[in-house]
Amino acid sequence: KTLLLTLVVVTIICLDFGYTRICFKTPYVKSETCPPGQELCYTKTWCDRFCSIRGKVIELGCTATCPRAEPKEDTTCCSKDNCNPHP
């Protein structure tokens, strides 16, 4: 019985039950837990037709792989909790 309990405890410690990343997400710029498998935070910015009035559009979120920046977009990724604050 003791051996079985020890094995269960060791298994739980080794599995770590899948830590998930915490990133800021838009539209509310809220710190949220990312879905399993999405271990990167990203920040994407671009200009829309109102750029000269209110600045660049900012998108924050979680991702499994860093999104490829399209023309006239800036994209950065990072791998620590809340490493993508609103610029």
UniProtKB/Swiss-Prot annotation:
The protein's matches in Pfam families, at most eight in alphabetical order, are given as: Toxin_cobra-type
Disulphide bridges, residue numbers:
C23-C41, C34-C62, C47-C51, C66-C77, C78-C83
Q: Which SUPFAM superfamilies match?
A: Snake toxin-like
InterPro entries (alphabetical) = Snake_3FTx, Snake_toxin-like_sf, Snake_toxin_con_site, Toxin_cobra-type
Query: From which residue to which does the signal peptide run?
Result: 1-20
Coiled coil ranges: none
Q: Which residues cross the membrane?
A: none
Q: Does the keyword Ribosomal protein apply?
A: no
Q: Where in the cell is it found?
A: Secreted
The alphabetical list of record keywords is: Acetylcholine receptor inhibiting toxin, Disulfide bond, Ion channel impairing toxin, Neurotoxin, Postsynaptic neurotoxin, Secreted, Signal, Toxin
Matching entries from CDD domains are given as:
TFP_snake_toxin
User: What tissues has this protein been observed in?
Assistant: Expressed by the venom gland.
MF (Gene Ontology): acetylcholine receptor inhibitor activity; ion channel regulator activity; toxin activity
PROSITE patterns recorded for this chain?
SNAKE_TOXIN
Q: Name one GO cellular component term.
A: extracellular region
Task: Give the domain of life.
Answer: Eukaryota
Query: Which family does the UniProt entry place this protein in?
Result: Belongs to the three-finger toxin family. Long-chain subfamily. Type II alpha-neurotoxin sub-subfamily.
The role this protein plays is:
Binds with high affinity to muscular (alpha-1/CHRNA1) and neuronal (alpha-7/CHRNA7) nicotinic acetylcholine receptor (nAChR) and inhibits acetylcholine from binding to the receptor, thereby impairing neuromuscular and neuronal transmission.
This protein is called Long neurotoxin LlLong
Ranked from the top, the taxonomy reads:
Eukaryota, Metazoa, Chordata, Craniata, Vertebrata
